[in-house]
């Protein structure tokens, strides 16, 4: 069985409800989907669609109020949260690095490892070896995002969750991160699930797309088809920018 034929992550009727203004709203509403290993998935939709809320349920940063997430056919609740997040890692809009050097940040997740090659992990995300001894506070946002990515990859995750990781970057840096994501997905057979508010970015990344509106999965398929020839009325309204 090839890399892309393996189903690595499933959601079944996944639901999350949160209190708001004295009532309860569903940020994720009965969402069922299967993710294959080694593919890139773009989660798109208008603001308030529940995209980030959905992402946070996949590695238990938040807990659902209904349904379940399965990782290799086992409920994610059967894994210790720390162990689960090593295999289903997440990067956020603003990268967080610990005080100290880049090397300190990389070695933080590597306790118990007999050998640690900072140069290798930096090169893998497109940074030169001399970055290892630079202070984390001296890096640009784009460089910090690469270091955060290198730190996640050291743990050899199967799934990488990305919550708008380029939203704070300039267009050139954003393109470089996009190219890096695609390269790593191919090289490592890594499943990438990325939330983006930018349809053009989703088109550049390609792969598969999921359109969410008001917590519901409206349609899914090839990203290019989803964003150029959607099959649903809500999909057409989203593409024509009627949904904000």
Where are the regions a protein language model picked out?
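Conserved ABC ATPase signature
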Residues: 135-139, 143
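Conserved ABC ATPase "signature" region
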Residues: 115-131
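Catalytic Walker B motif of ABC-type/P-loop ATPase nucleotide-binding domains
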Residues: 160-163
